């Protein structure tokens, strides 16, 4: 655990970044609102997109926005609905509400929101069921992706409902179950501490009664991300290598490095890719975009010449392989990372929650732990990052 002085210093730096809501005024909103999808215990909003030419039995892609973002803005910048028109799949965008989190982050580490059949995870599952049942979508081709808090929540969905998903795409996210308290969340984002690789594997295996097959996972990360440390990408990969039985410390089946993109792939015994890590040199915190006509750059949506949208869909097998999003199109990432602000899942973004939180784990029980929690919460309020 970091020292209190270290935590307070980081709070001051985060305060200076002035993370505020990213408005979508003037942006094209291609999404419709999905209503009456279930009991919605997580109190989330649901948006969706279905093209007029959507084929019968089409795949479904669930997209989870990052902190300070909303569904329409993320779709505009990431270009998922453009690719949906091209490749023929439906889209579901769960959307966070301020009553749940002051800065519109999915609550990726709170026990009451990340367990099967509870909170935000159950709300998203209900949305998926409504979409599939209403529109006749393919239950064997359901995928989930997200950025930052959305990436961490995508990991939650893959772990808690593995039988639902054929694949996932985690961008600047964190391993499932790696944090359950405010101090732990701080540390994991910075790359400090966390469960060992075997424990990470067990967290997924214990999140449901599912025993396989498991979803394939595409992981994307910037090497210069100072919000979610790059070491989280390897932790996510190790978590899913263990689940897939590929070996916790197994070297990749093959690896390539070209013009700023290092791609590592782990395949099963049949040679089928199950896990990939895409590390982009010099890129900060955000979703990588390419020069392939999908989406548009903006805050935390970084034009580095590599389309993660197309790359993830290609890895899942729902987009053409002869696309323009290959690494050969890439440009140096560091200027973009420097020019655009980092989307920091700060305490105000990831950790502040206005509805009553679930009781924390035993590690925070007792007077000393409660005192430490109070000190950190006081520091958050002093920095203007928590109510």
Predicted regions: what they are:
Residues 152-199, 215, 226-237:
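Hydrolase active-site cap/lid region
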Residues 54-102, 178:
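Short substrate-entry loop that stabilizes the transition state in hydrolases
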Residues 62-68, 172, 221, 281:
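The conserved beta1-alpha1 loop
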Residues 1-60, 72-78, 139, 145-149, ...:
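A domain-start/cap signature at the N-terminus of enzymes
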Residues 144-146, 171, 220:
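Short beta-strand immediately N-terminal to the catalytic nucleophile in serine-hydrolase-like folds
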Residues 112-135, 156:
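Alpha/beta-hydrolase active-site loop
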Residues 219-221, 225:
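Short beta-strand/loop motif that positions the catalytic acidic residue
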Residues 95-119, 182:
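Cap/lid segment of the alpha/beta-hydrolase catalytic domain
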């Amino acid at each position: 655990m970091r020292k209190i002085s270290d935590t307070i210093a980081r709070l001051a730096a985060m305060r200076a970044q002035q993370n505020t809501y990213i408005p979508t005024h003037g942006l094209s909103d291609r999404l419709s609102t999905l209503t009456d999808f279930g009991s919605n215990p997580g109190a989330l909003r649901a948006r969706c997109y279905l093209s007029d030419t959507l084929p019968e039995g089409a795949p479904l892609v669930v997209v989870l926005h990052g902190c300070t973002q909303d569904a329409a803005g993320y779709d505009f910048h990431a270009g998922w609905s453009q690719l949906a028109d091209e490749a023929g799949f439906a889209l579901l965008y769960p959307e966070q509400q301020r009553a749940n989190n002051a800065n519109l982050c999915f609550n990726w580490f709170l026990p009451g929101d990340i367990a099967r059949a509870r909170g935000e995870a159950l709300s998203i599952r209900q949305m998926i069921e409504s979409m599939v049942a209403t529109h006749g979508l393919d239950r064997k081709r359901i995928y989930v992706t997200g950025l930052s808090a959305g990436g961490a929540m995508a990991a939650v969905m893959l772990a808690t409902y593995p039988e639902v998903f054929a694949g996932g795409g985690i961008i600047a996210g964190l391993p499932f179950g790696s944090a359950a308290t405010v101090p732990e969340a701080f540390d994991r984002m910075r790359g400090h501490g966390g469960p060992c690789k075997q424990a990470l594997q067990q967290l997924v295996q214990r999140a449901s009664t599912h025993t396989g097959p498991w979803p394939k996972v595409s992981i994307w990360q910037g090497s210069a991300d100072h919000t979610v440390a790059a070491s989280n990408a390897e932790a996510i990969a190790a978590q899913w290598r263990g689940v897939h039985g590929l070996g916790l410390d197994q070297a990749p089946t093959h690896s390539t490095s070209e013009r700023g993109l290092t791609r590592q792939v782990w395949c099963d015994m049949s040679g089928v890719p199950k896990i990939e890590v895409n590390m982009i040199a010099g890129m900060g915190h955000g979703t990588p975009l390419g020069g392939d006509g999908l989406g548009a750059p903006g805050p935390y949506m970084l034009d580095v010449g590599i389309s993660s949208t197309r790359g993830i869909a290609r890895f899942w097998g729902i987009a053409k392989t002869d696309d323009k999003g290959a690494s050969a199109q890439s440009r140096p990432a560091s200027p973009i990372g420097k020019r655009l602000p980092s989307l920091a899942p700060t305490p105000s973004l990831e950790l502040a929650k206005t509805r009553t939180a679930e009781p924390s784990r035993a590690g925070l029980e007792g007077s000393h732990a409660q005192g430490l929690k109070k000190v950190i919460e006081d520091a958050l309020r002093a920095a203007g990052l928590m109510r």
